Swiss-Prot record:
Cu cation 1 binds at residue 75. It comes from Byssochlamys spectabilis. Keywords: Copper, Glycoprotein, Membrane, Metal-binding, Oxidoreductase, Repeat, Signal, Transmembrane, Transmembrane helix. Residues 26-139, 168-368, 466-585 form the Plastocyanin-like domain. The gene is VdtB. Cu cation 2 binds at residues 77, 119. Cu cation 4 binds at residue 500. Belongs to the multicopper oxidase family. Pathway: Secondary metabolite biosynthesis. This is Multicopper oxidase VdtB.
Length: 685
């Protein structure tokens, strides 16, 4: 190959990115992330799922093999899925469920760069452990906002290195009861339950039982005001009150809650997460992921201030903070200066005070730190002598700076269009019970809706035209989504909702108290200009409603990625109990779905199909009609097309037959006992 062609090929690869393949094997087995054993989901034998790291622009191919007893899918949270909507991972929208014993191929471009994560999107199985971090490194030479933190060239270089080699901290909650049992507890008790056993840091934690009276003494003023005649349980769980249960509180049956879920604390000791930093690096990036299913968490690192420089995978103008509230689905990347005395410092992550008094503890460990800088373990096993910002109850112990979540302007500046083309007003809230929800205000979105007839494949179906659950948009248009909570006099105060849209980031251009009584966003802007920000509005993929009574939020985005996408609350039980809608973006430019997805091959291309099906795919490539045409003249053309057509019809049927047989073989393998399966897997590997 001439040298210039080789150079050109290398440049093309740099632009397009490498082809990267990964395999995720899902199993249902015993685990004890907080010291208490239960059945759970493991990925490649571990929990949390493996951290996936790609370079910006990589061509990613991930084979997911389901060896569990239930079907599943995986969503790649925050990835735009431009031109690959069949890989978004939502059953009933972008794919059919991956049944037990089956496999599925996800293909997408690693873009945009930044901190993301992946998790199950089938029923409420996020509670069972299927989630992991996904990080996309920026291209070399990409500018960052480092000079807004420090103008020192050495600091800038150190921060750039740290941003591409972060310490990832997955924050999640965990309970002994699995997702099915938890949902049954909600339904049987007719109550919205928020209680868990543990907060986990990178899948590690313990069950803390500091004592009922100790917890009662730690109650802060708003708690006494919220339940003057009641108290928290020995697990720190809040009592059921009208602000969370609505007018159906009296219908609740606390006795139907399983033992140990709401009260009855039993301590268990599990592992403690520690991240090691080298002060010679000057700076470190700690990337926090809100992988919780219920909890709103408040992370801090003793004696270390944070510079938040990226939110939901997008650079912002850095903001200094000692702590912030991180909700389900959110991500915050924080730069910390490594200039403290070399020793251990506690990482403390309490619940932010919304549903339970509970916390997790980890360690920021300086390399070559002082081994004597320790104390006797306290009631939580903490041995550090560092000074905390907040107590176990999330109450400040000294002056601390909270992050203002409405003051997170994207960097460089990025603003939406001045006017929207369409407006959709959604009335979020309960659906005639404490534990069922609606996003549209009209209907619940069933968790298995159109599961086996994905709307991506059936954009003109009857289910794709249900105005109560479906929004249809035109490509290139600007859409305004108005989220209204507290609109019903039956429940004027509603618990916050973390609303996430697939395939898009969007701007929060406005928000205000009261009821939305406007025919357009422009009318509202004219009436309440102080409630809108069109200069530097926050830009991310997850936004919140507020716990302040009736209020509204206006979100704006442009339709640039046609496909079937989900809009939903990221609290797992809210989603599984109905708080979602489908947005069919760009119905006028609907994507063509490749045959390997529409024809039941689960993303496997002809030559990739297992067993004999793969053989027939290879043979078909050799004997397809166009190959015969190349070998003959004009007289052969008609004959080759005729023979080739018959051959393609026959081999397609055979290929499908062998694929079905291969999947049945996978199910047979799945049904073997656990030890035999592991032995078989060892042989295959």
């Amino acid at each position: 190959m001439p040298a210039y062609l080789l150079l050109l090929a290398c440049n093309v690869l740099l632009v397009l990115g490498a082809h990267v393949q990964r395999e995720l094997v899902l199993t249902w087995e015993e685990g004890a992330p907080n010291g208490q054993s239960r059945q759970m989901i493991k990925t490649n034998g571990q929990f949390p799922s493996p951290t996936l790291i790609f370079d910006e622009g990589d061509d990613v191919e991930i084979v997911v093999r389901n060896y569990m007893h239930e079907n599943t899918t995986i969503h790649w949270h925050g990835i735009l899925m431009q031109d690959t909507p069949w890989s978004d991972g939502v059953p009933g929208l972008s794919q059919k469920p991956i049944e037990p014993g089956e496999s599925y191929v996800y293909r997408f471009t690693a873009y945009p760069p930044g901190q993301y994560w992946y998790h199950s999107h089938s029923r409420a199985t996020l509670l069972d452990g299927l989630y992991g971090a996904l990080f996309i490194r920026r291209k070399p030479g990409t500018a960052g906002p480092w000079a807004m933190i420090s103008e020192d060239p050495e600091d800038i270089a150190a921060m750039e290195r740290a941003s591409n080699n972060p310490h990832i901290m997955m924050l999640s909650d965990w309970d002994y009861y699995n997702s099915t049992q938890y949902k049954e507890a909600d339904a049987n008790s007719r109550l919205q339950i928020f209680c868990v056993d543990s907060i986990l840091l990178n899948g590690k934690g313990s069950v803390y039982c500091p004592g009922h009276q100790w917890l009662i003494d730690k109650q802060i003023p708003f708690m006494h005001k919220s339940w003057p005649n009641d108290t928290i349980t020995d697990k720190g769980c809040f009592p059921f009150v009208p602000s969370t249960e609505g007018p159906w509180l009296a219908d609740g049956n606390v006795s139907a809650i399983p033992p140990g879920l709401q009260e009855g604390c039993v301590p268990y000791s599990g592992p403690t997460e520690a991240i090691e930093v080298d002060p010679a690096d000057r700076w470190a990036s700690v990337n926090w992921i809100g992988g919780s299913t219920f909890k709103t968490l408040q992370p801090t690192i003793d004696e270390h201030e944070m510079w938040i420089y990226e939110v939901d995978g997008h650079y912002i103008e850095p903001r200094r903070a000692d702590t912030f509230l991180i909700w389900a689905g959110e991500r915050y990347s924080a730069m910390i200066r490594l200039d403290k005395k070399p020793m251990d410092y506690s990482i403390r992550v309490p619940d932010g005070g919304y549903s339970q008094m509970i916390a997790a503890f980890g360690i920021l460990r300086y390399k070559n730190g002082d081994p004597n800088a320790r104390q006797k373990p306290d009631r939580f096993g903490v041995t550090t002598i560092s000074k905390p910002y907040f107590d176990y109850n999330a109450w400040p112990m000294r002056d601390a700076v909270f992050l203002d979540k409405l003051d997170l302007p994207p960097w460089p500046r990025k603003v939406p269009a001045a006017h929207g083309d369409d407006m959709h007003v959604l009335y979020l809230g309960k659906a005639n019970s404490t534990w069922e929800f609606t996003l549209s205000g009209k209907k619940k979105y069933p968790p298995d809706r159109s599961a086996y007839e994905p709307l991506l494949y059936n954009v003109n179906s009857e289910q794709a035209h249900d105005d109560d659950l479906i929004i249809r948009t035109q490509n290139g248009t600007w859409q305004d989504i108005v989220l209204q909570v507290g609109h019903s006099p039956l429940w004027p105060v509603d618990f916050p909702h973390a609303v996430h849209k697939h395939a898009n980031k969007y701007w929060r251009i406005g928000g205000g108290q009261g009821l939305w009584n406007y025919s357009s966003v422009e009318e509202a802007m004219a009436d309440q200009p102080e409630s809108f920000n069109m200069v530097n509005p926050p830009y991310r993929d997850t936004f919140l409603t507020e716990f302040t009574g009736a209020m509204w939020v206006v979100l704006r985005y442009q339709v640039t990625s046609p496909g079937a996408w989900l809009l939903h609350c990221h609290f797992e039980m809210h989603l599984d109990n109905g708080m979602a809608m489908a947005i069919l973006d760009g119905v006028d430019k609907w994507p063509h779905v490749p045959p390997e997805y529409t024809q039941g091959f689960h993303g496997f291309r002809e030559h990739e199909l297992p067993g004999p099906a793969g053989f027939w795919g290879l043979v078909s490539k050799i004997l397809r009609p166009e190959s015969l045409v190349w070998a003959g003249g004009a007289a052969v053309v008609l004959l080759s097309l005729f023979i080739g057509g018959l051959w393609r019809l026959w081999q397609r049927r055979m290929q499908g037959t062998y694929y079905v047989l291969s999947q049945e073989d996978e199910r047979d393998r799945f049904s073997m006992d656990k030890e035999a399966w592991k032995s078989e897997e060892t042989k295959r590997m």
